[in-house]
Amino acid sequence: VCMILSDQLIVDNGDFVVEHLDASTENRHSVDSFASGNNAQGLELYLKNFALNDELLNESRTYLVKDSLSKALACYFSLRTCLVPIALTKSLFTTVSAVELANFAVNENYRKKQRAIKKIGAYVFLEFILPIVKHIANLVGARWLCVYALPDEKLIRYYESLGFARL
């Protein structure tokens, strides 16, 4: 279920609420309690130190996924538009318009408190990220959703399990 309220896209499916980082002072302060996993310190650093500035400069949109009951920050993701270069031949390239899933991380503090919730990342991807990206693609004409995964085979396999393919 989606509703556009002023310039903020609000999504609420009863379990989680998705809001822009800049939608409220409460949202801006909720990131202080975010903790990423062992290999994702850069995602935590981005959320706490750079995401709001990127939001204000219209470089990307950062969405906070909060528990509907407790309002605890469960995870976040950032989206932006991009062009993906495609080699047609060795010397001829073209580009394809896309939406980039620039950042995506689960709050380990939330995961520890909510052990009964399994595969929250996949759930958020399917329930929130894909519908928002499809809406964006219809508005701006993007053909792909892309993610630039670090050279971590486990992470790449995870994205492949969600339907991504290596280029």
Where are these regions (language model features)?
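Non-catalytic substrate-recognition and accessory regions of acyl/acetyltransferase enzymes
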Residues: 1-117, 123, 127, 131-146, ...
